[in-house]
C-alpha cells in the first residue's frame, strides 16, 4: 500500500541526491530506498543519519553493486534489508533470482514464510531425513524462493566476482578514453 516518492539523483554518481531526501519526507514516509547504481555507493552516512532522525527504515537496493564498498565496508551492512539481484544483466547471474541480506531475525523469519507462498516449511525441510513433516499456511505469500539449479549457478558465479569486476573497470576506462575527446559527453 505504499506510495513511492522519488528524489532526484546526483549528476556525479547517478545515485539518489542525499541533500534532497529530507524535503521529500512526509508524515507517511516509512523508508528510504537508496539505489547503489553501477557499482557506486550512495552517501550512506548521510542517509542513515536522516533515517535515524526521522525513525525510518533504510532498504538498500544493491542490484548493481555486489562488490561495491562504502568506506571500506561491503554494501549490505548498513540498511536492513539489502536486496541484490542476480538477473542476467547484473554483476553475476543465476538467470533469475536474487538475495536479501539482513540483521533482524524476526524480519528474516517473516520473509522466509512470505517467499514460499506463506507456507511455514520449504520442501527440503518437509521431505528431509526425518520424513514428511506437516506445514502450515501462515499468510498469503509470494514465490520468491530461488530454484536449486539457479543457486548452483550463482555459487559458481561467485568464484568469478573479482574477475568480472576487473573486466568492467577495464571496459569503463576504455569508454572513458574513447569519449574523452567529445566535449558534449561527460564520463565519471
Can you describe what each PLM-predicted range is?
Residues 1:
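Structured binding elements
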Residues 8, 19, 23, 31-35, ...:
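PLP-dependent aminotransferase class I/II
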Residues 12-13, 39, 90:
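Glycine-/small-residue-rich active-site loops that bind phosphorylated ligands and cofactors
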Residues 30-31, 57, 81:
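Short, Asp-centered acidic motifs that coordinate Mg2+ and/or phosphate
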Residues 35, 59-60:
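Hydrophobic residues in beta-strands of the RecA-like P-loop NTPase core, especially within AAA+ ATPase
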Residues 60-94, 133-138:
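Conserved active-site segment immediately N-terminal to the catalytic lysine
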Residues 84-85, 98-103, 155:
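Short beta-strand-to-turn element immediately C-terminal to the catalytic PLP-Schiff-base lysine
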Amino acid at each position: 500500500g505504499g506510495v513511492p516518492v522519488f528524489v532526484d539523483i546526483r549528476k556525479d554518481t547517478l545515485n539518489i541526491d542525499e541533500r534532497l531526501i529530507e524535503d521529500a519526507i512526509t508524515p507517511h514516509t516509512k523508508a528510504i530506498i537508496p539505489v547503489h547504481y553501477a557499482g557506486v555507493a550512495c552517501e550512506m552516512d548521510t542517509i542513515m543519519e536522516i533515517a535515524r532522525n526521522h525513525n525510518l527504515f533504510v532498504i538498500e537496493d544493491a542490484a548493481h553493486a555486489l562488490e561495491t564498498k562504502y568506506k571500506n565496508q561491503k554494501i549490505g551492512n548498513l540498511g536492513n534489508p539489502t536486496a541484490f539481484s542476480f538477473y542476467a544483466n547484473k554483476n553475476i547471474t543465476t538467470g533469475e533470482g536474487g538475495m536479501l541480506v539482513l540483521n533482524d531475525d524476526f524480519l528474516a523469519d517473516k520473509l522466509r514464510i512470505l517467499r514460499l507462498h506463506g507456507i511455514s516449511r520449504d520442501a527440503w525441510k518437509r521431505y528431509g531425513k526425518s520424513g514428511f513433516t506437516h506445514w502450515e499456511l501462515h499468510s498469503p505469500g509470494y514465490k520468491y524462493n530461488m530454484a536449486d539449479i539457479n543457486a548452483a549457478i550463482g555459487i559458481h558465479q561467485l568464484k568469478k566476482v573479482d574477475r568480472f569486476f576487473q573486466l568492467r573497470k577495464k571496459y569503463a576506462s576504455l569508454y572513458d578514453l574513447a569519449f574523452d575527446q567529445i566535449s558534449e559527453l561527460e564520463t565519471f
